[in-house]
């Protein structure tokens, strides 16, 4: 929760600074955001190697590896259903937002970066904001409703609801509600989704 509040604070601070032109030179540096994203992806790879997760992964069954794929697939299906109700933007834009799978910090910037050329800065900013808020709400729901998910749907459902956050913010809640045995599955889901999310977003943003 603290991490989410920090992200919101910095996001609002950025809006205020940009609107009032408080730091003019930042507009010249906007194009460098994509390189920051590349660095973030490299750090994910470093974390994977540093924590030596390979032995843990080898002990898991096929279901554990399929979970992140079902998580992403289910997210995209329900995102498409939301599009049928709302129709505010094209379907592929909705799918780009849903394809973030809870990765709000990356998705908001990535969507803005890839949509501003085709849709304009205004629409790109709107989509980035929606991605930030909707995926942040997903994380909050996972944190607050964890006991309900665990009790009525099982611990796979709880891990799936967390999306990418199953590897960090929601992990303590998963352990508390599901026990230590759920940790390897949660970590594998987080790692696989961290790899899938940038690819999924770029795919739908290019349509």
Which functions belong to the PLM regions below?
Residues 1-56, 69-85, 204-207:
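Structural signature of multi-pass alpha-helical membrane transport proteins
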Residues 2-6, 33-34, 58-70, 93-100, ...:
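Cytoplasmic-side transmembrane-helix entry/capping segments in multi-pass membrane proteins
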Residues 10-15, 38-43, 65-77, 97-109, ...:
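Small-residue-rich segments of transmembrane alpha-helices in multi-pass membrane proteins
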Residues 20-25, 81-92, 113-130, 203-207:
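Helix-coil boundary and interhelical linker segments in multi-pass alpha-helical membrane proteins
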Residues 37-41, 142-146, 158, 170, ...:
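Alpha-helical transmembrane segments and their lipid-water interface positions
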Residues 52-80, 127-140, 185-193:
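Entry/N-cap segments of selected transmembrane alpha helices
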Residues 92-141, 149, 153-188:
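Alpha-helical membrane segments and immediately flanking helix-loop junctions
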Residues 178-207:
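Long hydrophobic alpha-helical segments typical of transmembrane helices together
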